A protein has these predicted regions:
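Polybasic low-complexity intrinsically disordered regions
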Residues: 1-181, 185-187, 194
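A glycine-rich phosphate-binding loop feature that marks nucleotide/adenosyl-phosphate handling sites
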Residues: 39-40, 185-192, 250, 278-285
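Composition- and surface-driven signal marking solvent-exposed, interaction-prone regions
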Residues: 153-155, 196-197, 246-249, 272-280
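Helix-centered, glycine/charged polyanion-binding patches within enzymatic domains
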Residues: 178-250
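A short, flexible helix-boundary coil/loop motif
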Residues: 238, 242-243, 268-285
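Amphipathic alpha-helical/coiled-coil segments positioned at domain termini
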Residues: 252-253, 257
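Hydrophobic transmembrane alpha-helical segments of multi-pass transport and channel proteins
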Residues: 264-265
Length: 285
C-alpha cells in the first residue's frame, strides 16, 4: 500500500475542514455572515475528543451532529448570498461535494476520506499496529535472479490481488519485451492459475503425481518469492514509497515509478563500482 499524505480521517475532521473552507470562501467574496461558529467549533472539538469514553460517547455523537448542521447552515447561506452566475458555474459542484461528504455514514461504500485527495480509498491490512491504511494499492514484480524490478502498477481501485495480475503482467511484457512464462505469487493471489500465456504458481501442498525433483523445485521457487518482501520494505523506507506527497492518481504513478527506477539505478551503480574496483585491482596487479 502506498499511503497518501493525509491525516487520519474522521467525520469530525472532515466537517471542521468544510466549515473552515466555507468561512474562507465567504471572506474571499466579501459576504457578511450571520455567524461563523468559530467559538462553538472549539467547544465541539473538545467534546469529540472523548468519543471512545463510554460515558461521553453520546455527547460526542451530539457534537458531531451539530458540526454537520453548522456546515449545512453555512452552505445554505452562501447559496443565498453568492451571485447566481458565480454559484452555478463555479461553486455548485464544490457545494455538492461537501454535501456528499457530510451525508456519509459509518457503513457506506466508496467513502471520501480527504477533501484534497478524494480518490484515496481504505485498505484493511489486519495488522495490530495499523489495521487500516489510506492510499492506493501497488503491485511490484521483480526478477527471480538479481532482484531487478521489471513491473510496477498503481491501482486506482481496491481490487482483489488476483484481479491485479493482468495489468502487472502486461507492464512486465512491455518492460522486458517478452511475456512471462511463470509468475510466482503468494496466497493472496489465489483464484487464478493462468493469465493469458503466464502460469500462476502459488504455495500449496504438492501434487501426488509430482516427483521429488518437482516438489523441491516448487518449494525453492516459493521461498525465492519471499525476496520481494524486503524489496518492498526498502522501497518504503529508503525510496519514499511509504508516504506519497504528489497529488492525484497521476502523482501515485509518478511516485511509484521514481521509487522503482531509483532501486534499479542503485543496483546498477553497485555493480558498476564493483566492476571498476576489480578492473583497478587487476591493473595494479
Amino acid at each position: 500500500v502506498q499511503e497518501k499524505n493525509i491525516t487520519y480521517p474522521t467525520d469530525a475532521k472532515l466537517a471542521i475542514k468544510i466549515i473552515n473552507r466555507l468561512n474562507k470562501l465567504a471572506k474571499f467574496h466579501g459576504i457578511s455572515q450571520r455567524r461563523t461558529f468559530v467559538k462553538e467549533i472549539k467547544n465541539l472539538r473538545l467534546s469529540i475528543r472523548h468519543f471512545r469514553h463510554v460515558k461521553k460517547r453520546s455527547k460526542a455523537r451530539k457534537a458531531l451532529k451539530r458540526l454537520r448542521t453548522i456546515a449545512h447552515i453555512l452552505i445554505r447561506e452562501l447559496r443565498r448570498k453568492l451571485p447566481q452566475t458565480c454559484l452555478f458555474e463555479c461553486l455548485q459542484e464544490q457545494f455538492l461535494f461537501y454535501e456528499r461528504v457530510l451525508a456519509q455514514q459509518l457503513r457506506d461504500k466508496n467513502k471520501i476520506y480527504s477533501l484534497h485527495e478524494p480518490q484515496v480509498y481504505c485498505i484493511a491490512k489486519g495488522k495490530d499496529h495499523k489495521q487500516y491504511e489510506y492510499g492506493n494499492k501497488v503491485s511490484v514484480a521483480s526478477t527471480a535472479k538479481g532482484n531487478i524490478i521489471v513491473g510496477v502498477v498503481s491501482h486506482d481501485k481496491n481490487l482483489h490481488d488476483s484481479h491485479t495480475l493482468p495489468e502487472v503482467l502486461r507492464h512486465i511484457e512491455v518492460t522486458r519485451g517478452s511475456a512471462v512464462k511463470t509468475a510466482i505469487c503468494d496466497r493472496g493471489y489465489r483464484g487464478k492459475s493462468q493469465v493469458n500465456e503466464t502460469t500462476i504458481q502459488l504455495p500449496k501442498k504438492p501434487l501426488k503425481r509430482d516427483n521429488r525433483y518437482q516438489r523441491d523445485k516448487k518449494r525453492k521457487q516459493c521461498r525465492r518469492r519471499a525476496a520481494i518482501e524486503p524489496i518492498i520494505g526498502h522501497l518504503k523506507s529508503d525510496f519514499r514509497l511509504s508516504r506519497n506527497f504528489l497529488k492525484g492518481t497521476l502523482g501515485d504513478e509518478i511516485n511509484l515509478l521514481m521509487a522503482a527506477t531509483a532501486w534499479n539505478l542503485r543496483k546498477w551503480l553497485i555493480a558498476f563500482f564493483w566492476w571498476l574496483f576489480l578492473v583497478r585491482k587487476e591493473a595494479l596487479d
